[in-house]
Amino acid sequence: MLTLSSSEAAGRTGDGFVTAFFWRKNPVLERIQQVIAENCCGKLCSLRFTWSRPKRFATGEREFLYDTFAAMLDGAQQLAGAEFRSLYVEKVPGMNNLFALARFTNEVAAECELNECLPETMPDICFVKANFSNGHVTNQPLVGYFNEEGMVFATDEILEFPVAELASLPPANGPVEQMKQRFTEAARLGLVPPGPGNAAAIQTMIREALR
């Protein structure tokens, strides 16, 4: 069985940096796309993405900005269905911690909150929220701060919140792993479009916003 990382599945090569657009396979994002297509909640007005991970998963700044953050912006654009109008970024110097506000040409706005600074004992926190003129679609709990309730595996040393997935995939240890597993499986089945997509344009936009 061929196993690919998200980056490999997206076509990254050793001499170039290609963003892995794994948010496209986020199950909540896919559900929001379905709601948009069915037009059952009215007009899409705004989006909010949250990505928080323990410090042990912190990547280098380059990967954090041009892979993790860029993939989130791509996910927002997939839902907005329009070109970017502007991007505002506030980043904590020397840390993988930022807030961003992206606006699209159809007046949809997307808030992006990312950090890889959580205490080691905390699980991944990964939410998407879509605000429509007549309702909301989100996996963010109405009460509490962690991911939606599900399976729990706990010992004196560890605390895990596995996410049940397709029978063909193993239980994922949190929503980030689940999303990447789905992306890898989609690539294995030939469902991931080849090529870099609009990675270069998004990366350039991030550089300009950070100047």
Pin down the residues of each PLM region.
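A contiguous active-site-proximal alpha/beta segment in oxidoreductase catalytic domains
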Residues: 2-57
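A structural signal for the main folded, soluble domain(s) of proteins
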Residues: 14-16, 20-21, 140, 144-177
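Short, amphipathic alpha-helical segments
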Residues: 23-26, 66-70
